[in-house]
Design a protein with these regions (language model features):
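Catalytic binding pocket for nucleotide-activated donors in carbohydrate/polymer assembly enzymes
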Residues: 23, 48, 56, 61-180
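Extended, charge-rich helix/loop segments that form flexible
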Residues: 1-30, 35, 39-54
Length: 180
Protein backbone atom coordinates (compact mmCIF):
# COMPACT_ATOMS: atom_id res chain seq x y z
CA UNK A 1 0.00 0.00 0.00
CA UNK A 2 1.04 3.55 -0.59
CA UNK A 3 1.45 5.55 2.64
CA UNK A 4 -1.64 7.53 3.59
CA UNK A 5 -4.07 6.02 1.08
CA UNK A 6 -6.53 3.14 1.23
CA UNK A 7 -6.22 -0.29 -0.34
CA UNK A 8 -8.71 0.70 -3.04
CA UNK A 9 -6.69 3.83 -3.81
CA UNK A 10 -3.53 1.71 -3.93
CA UNK A 11 -5.17 -0.62 -6.45
CA UNK A 12 -6.20 2.40 -8.52
CA UNK A 13 -2.62 3.76 -8.47
CA UNK A 14 -1.25 0.41 -9.56
CA UNK A 15 -3.76 0.27 -12.42
CA UNK A 16 -2.79 3.80 -13.48
CA UNK A 17 0.82 2.65 -13.73
CA UNK A 18 0.07 -0.58 -15.59
CA UNK A 19 1.79 0.53 -18.80
CA UNK A 20 4.95 1.41 -16.89
CA UNK A 21 5.03 -2.20 -15.65
CA UNK A 22 4.57 -3.50 -19.20
CA UNK A 23 7.41 -1.28 -20.46
CA UNK A 24 9.78 -2.35 -17.67
CA UNK A 25 8.99 -6.02 -18.28
CA UNK A 26 9.66 -5.64 -22.01
CA UNK A 27 13.02 -3.97 -21.40
CA UNK A 28 14.07 -6.68 -18.93
CA UNK A 29 12.95 -9.50 -21.23
CA UNK A 30 14.88 -7.98 -24.12
CA UNK A 31 18.02 -7.80 -21.98
CA UNK A 32 17.59 -11.45 -21.00
CA UNK A 33 17.38 -12.43 -24.66
CA UNK A 34 20.46 -10.31 -25.45
CA UNK A 35 22.35 -12.22 -22.74
CA UNK A 36 21.13 -15.56 -24.12
CA UNK A 37 22.34 -14.58 -27.59
CA UNK A 38 25.72 -13.41 -26.26
CA UNK A 39 26.12 -16.78 -24.55
CA UNK A 40 24.92 -18.70 -27.61
CA UNK A 41 21.90 -20.28 -25.95
CA UNK A 42 19.34 -21.25 -28.62
CA UNK A 43 15.99 -19.62 -27.94
CA UNK A 44 12.41 -19.61 -29.21
CA UNK A 45 10.55 -16.37 -28.54
CA UNK A 46 6.79 -16.46 -28.00
CA UNK A 47 4.65 -13.35 -27.82
CA UNK A 48 4.29 -10.15 -29.77
CA UNK A 49 6.91 -7.71 -31.09
CA UNK A 50 9.84 -10.11 -30.90
CA UNK A 51 10.28 -9.76 -34.66
CA UNK A 52 10.95 -6.03 -34.17
CA UNK A 53 13.44 -6.80 -31.41
CA UNK A 54 15.19 -9.40 -33.55
CA UNK A 55 15.55 -6.97 -36.45
CA UNK A 56 17.31 -4.53 -34.10
CA UNK A 57 19.44 -7.32 -32.60
CA UNK A 58 20.64 -8.35 -36.05
CA UNK A 59 21.85 -4.78 -36.64
CA UNK A 60 23.27 -4.10 -33.17
CA UNK A 61 24.78 -7.54 -32.49
CA UNK A 62 26.62 -8.15 -35.77
CA UNK A 63 29.17 -10.39 -34.02
CA UNK A 64 26.32 -12.78 -33.25
CA UNK A 65 24.46 -12.51 -36.56
CA UNK A 66 25.14 -16.09 -37.69
CA UNK A 67 23.96 -17.44 -34.32
CA UNK A 68 20.85 -15.24 -34.36
CA UNK A 69 19.84 -16.33 -37.86
CA UNK A 70 20.32 -20.02 -37.03
CA UNK A 71 19.30 -20.37 -33.37
CA UNK A 72 16.89 -17.56 -32.43
CA UNK A 73 13.35 -18.21 -33.63
CA UNK A 74 10.38 -15.88 -33.34
CA UNK A 75 7.29 -18.04 -32.90
CA UNK A 76 4.70 -15.28 -32.51
CA UNK A 77 1.75 -15.07 -30.19
CA UNK A 78 0.14 -18.20 -28.84
CA UNK A 79 -3.04 -18.86 -26.90
CA UNK A 80 -3.01 -19.96 -23.29
CA UNK A 81 -4.31 -23.36 -24.41
CA UNK A 82 -1.20 -23.87 -26.56
CA UNK A 83 1.22 -23.36 -23.66
CA UNK A 84 1.13 -26.89 -22.16
CA UNK A 85 2.30 -28.42 -25.45
CA UNK A 86 4.99 -25.75 -25.85
CA UNK A 87 6.28 -26.32 -22.32
CA UNK A 88 6.08 -30.08 -22.82
CA UNK A 89 8.44 -29.79 -25.79
CA UNK A 90 10.88 -27.38 -24.11
CA UNK A 91 13.71 -28.07 -21.69
CA UNK A 92 13.31 -24.76 -19.88
CA UNK A 93 11.19 -21.63 -19.80
CA UNK A 94 12.65 -18.25 -18.94
CA UNK A 95 10.16 -16.16 -17.02
CA UNK A 96 10.20 -12.58 -15.80
CA UNK A 97 7.50 -11.80 -13.29
CA UNK A 98 5.24 -8.79 -13.58
CA UNK A 99 6.00 -6.23 -10.92
CA UNK A 100 4.04 -8.00 -8.17
CA UNK A 101 7.12 -9.27 -6.43
CA UNK A 102 5.35 -11.05 -3.59
CA UNK A 103 3.34 -13.56 -5.63
CA UNK A 104 3.65 -16.07 -8.43
CA UNK A 105 2.67 -16.06 -12.09
CA UNK A 106 0.96 -19.14 -13.50
CA UNK A 107 3.79 -19.60 -16.03
CA UNK A 108 5.94 -21.27 -13.36
CA UNK A 109 3.45 -23.94 -12.21
CA UNK A 110 2.39 -24.53 -15.83
CA UNK A 111 6.01 -25.04 -16.91
CA UNK A 112 6.72 -27.47 -14.07
CA UNK A 113 3.51 -29.44 -14.61
CA UNK A 114 4.49 -29.94 -18.23
CA UNK A 115 8.05 -31.12 -17.66
CA UNK A 116 9.89 -27.87 -18.15
CA UNK A 117 12.38 -26.22 -15.77
CA UNK A 118 11.21 -22.71 -14.85
CA UNK A 119 13.98 -20.11 -14.78
CA UNK A 120 12.56 -16.98 -13.19
CA UNK A 121 13.43 -13.88 -11.20
CA UNK A 122 11.27 -15.12 -8.34
CA UNK A 123 9.47 -13.29 -5.58
CA UNK A 124 9.41 -13.25 -1.81
CA UNK A 125 6.56 -15.76 -1.92
CA UNK A 126 8.28 -18.09 -4.38
CA UNK A 127 11.61 -18.07 -2.56
CA UNK A 128 9.83 -18.79 0.72
CA UNK A 129 7.41 -21.45 -0.52
CA UNK A 130 9.16 -23.27 -3.39
CA UNK A 131 12.15 -25.39 -2.33
CA UNK A 132 15.42 -25.02 -4.23
CA UNK A 133 15.24 -28.60 -5.54
CA UNK A 134 11.77 -28.25 -7.07
CA UNK A 135 12.56 -27.55 -10.73
CA UNK A 136 12.65 -23.78 -10.32
CA UNK A 137 15.90 -21.91 -10.88
CA UNK A 138 16.20 -18.26 -9.90
CA UNK A 139 18.16 -15.42 -11.44
CA UNK A 140 18.58 -11.91 -10.08
CA UNK A 141 17.23 -8.82 -11.80
CA UNK A 142 20.21 -7.02 -10.26
CA UNK A 143 22.58 -9.27 -12.21
CA UNK A 144 20.97 -9.57 -15.64
CA UNK A 145 24.40 -9.54 -17.25
CA UNK A 146 24.95 -13.01 -15.72
CA UNK A 147 21.63 -14.62 -16.71
CA UNK A 148 22.84 -15.92 -20.08
CA UNK A 149 25.88 -17.59 -18.58
CA UNK A 150 23.76 -19.10 -15.79
CA UNK A 151 21.25 -20.54 -18.24
CA UNK A 152 23.98 -21.81 -20.55
CA UNK A 153 25.59 -23.74 -17.68
CA UNK A 154 22.20 -25.09 -16.54
CA UNK A 155 21.27 -26.52 -19.94
CA UNK A 156 24.78 -27.85 -20.56
CA UNK A 157 24.34 -30.30 -17.67
CA UNK A 158 21.78 -32.61 -19.30
CA UNK A 159 21.67 -35.06 -16.40
CA UNK A 160 21.00 -32.31 -13.90
CA UNK A 161 18.29 -30.81 -16.14
CA UNK A 162 16.52 -34.18 -16.31
CA UNK A 163 16.61 -34.43 -12.51
CA UNK A 164 15.27 -30.88 -12.16
CA UNK A 165 12.44 -31.69 -14.59
CA UNK A 166 11.47 -34.82 -12.63
CA UNK A 167 11.55 -32.93 -9.31
CA UNK A 168 9.58 -30.06 -10.85
CA UNK A 169 6.84 -32.34 -12.17
CA UNK A 170 6.59 -34.08 -8.80
CA UNK A 171 6.51 -30.79 -6.89
CA UNK A 172 3.84 -29.36 -9.20
CA UNK A 173 1.69 -32.48 -8.89
CA UNK A 174 2.05 -32.46 -5.10
CA UNK A 175 1.47 -28.74 -4.57
CA UNK A 176 -0.52 -27.33 -7.48
CA UNK A 177 -2.82 -30.04 -8.73
CA UNK A 178 -6.37 -30.80 -7.74
CA UNK A 179 -5.13 -34.15 -6.43
CA UNK A 180 -3.93 -32.76 -3.12
Amino acid sequence: MYPGISGVQTAEKLQENFMADVYIQAAIRQEIVVQLIRNHVPVKLYGHNWDTFLTKAEVLMKDNLTFIKKFVKVCGEVTYGELPAIYNNARFSVNQLPWFKAGIHDRTPLALMNGCVSITDGSTYMRREIPMDSGVEYYSLDELENVGEKIKSLVADVGSMKEKVARGVQYAEDMWSWKH
